[in-house]
């Protein structure tokens, strides 16, 4: 029968073959025709690299099938795979091999089915659809092979008494199933169980995989007491204390209960709920603190500490503060010393602008730290926007303005609808939800305004099944936007999509015009297999 072999240059070779020919034989025929040594040939069919010892019929290659020929750079490379038993396997690979190919090579050597293999490199689990070069795996790198146990995984459940229970589960188990397993082991009725993971209470109808709970994750079990009410107090060390309270208890009473449990004097306790510091004379119900609410406990250090504030003129001010002081409090102290109104002050620490409602300890500002004080000019700052026609527009803005706000100001001045505006700064397209300060756009910076043409253009996306999708796009659309349009049409999540054009994988942050993708170009869509557990 005849088959075709297509090279990366676009040339197609026709070969006479038998279904019983090995891949090695086929490479020999290609060498006769094209002079390419077999050890430099890699043959791909249906997205899989073909192995020398297998036959065409093994791969279901039939008459007039097309194989793709990719040249190996001479020599390839060796990598090592270390198993949990300590055994090390050596593999011959190419940087362009997918993780799937590597698992197939491990199966050939060790007989372990790919679906039981998990490969780890640099602490990351490797996904089947990615290549070794995607993960920067180079010659003589060592991967770690962990076996998945068939039929599920173990997780741990830790109770408030400190006891840890081990459960056998599946990623597809619901939280309800998990509570039933806990009842089997511990006799606690499900309606008295609350399960917490990553600070979130888990809902009965959801599955473990919905919450990204993987093998050997630890859940926390909190019991609901019938009647009365429990609240939780979380300390900065991460410890959680459970208290029995009444809605009519004052904050003072609550601090006394914390003192009983933890020995911390009330005058060193600050309690925070919903971002607010709680006042001693108020009650829990005043703050709408209900059963199972979590308060945060911050300790006041006795006697405070000193910090320094450096102004742009070079002057340094010394302030007496507490770690629990808010940035607002600090600005008030600066006003007392220097007469500068708080709304004209911007405080910077470790390159970050500090927000009024946060505390010094939130930013890990410790004794003798130095903050930098920058004055806001009343009425913000000016920036310039340059259009492609060469016209320059001046705008009054604040560093905290979003790109969306800026586009609205341009619309006010120039009448250009925001959805036709693309703003560029330092070579980057600016995203609507970000602020000027996120992009370090300062006074008298110049942005460039590029107009999106209405009407756009059509491109085609071809899937591995051969289906072709038509999309309406703009040259200024990012690859991320294109993946979102594919999701709208086909329901494929963007993180499972890889788009290829002219042999290159396209990166999310780039635009179609960056890749010179023009109207009626065809992109190829390859699906990433999910990594799973």
Curated annotation (Swiss-Prot):
InterPro entries: Ubiquitin-like_dom (IPR000626), Ubiquitin-like_domsf (IPR029071), Ubiquitin_CS (IPR019954), Ubiquitin_dom (IPR019956), Ubiquitin_ubiquitin-like (IPR050158). There is a cross-link at residues 6, 11, 27, 29, 33, 48, 63 (Glycyl lysine isopeptide (Lys-Gly) (interchain with G-Cter in ubiquitin)). The modification ADP-ribosylglycine is found at residue 76. CDD domains: Ubl_ubiquitin. One of its GO terms (cellular component) is mitochondrial outer membrane. The record marks 54, 72 as: Interacts with activating enzyme. The keyword DNA damage does not apply. GO terms for molecular function: protein tag activity; ubiquitin protein ligase binding. Belongs to the ubiquitin family. This is Polyubiquitin-C.
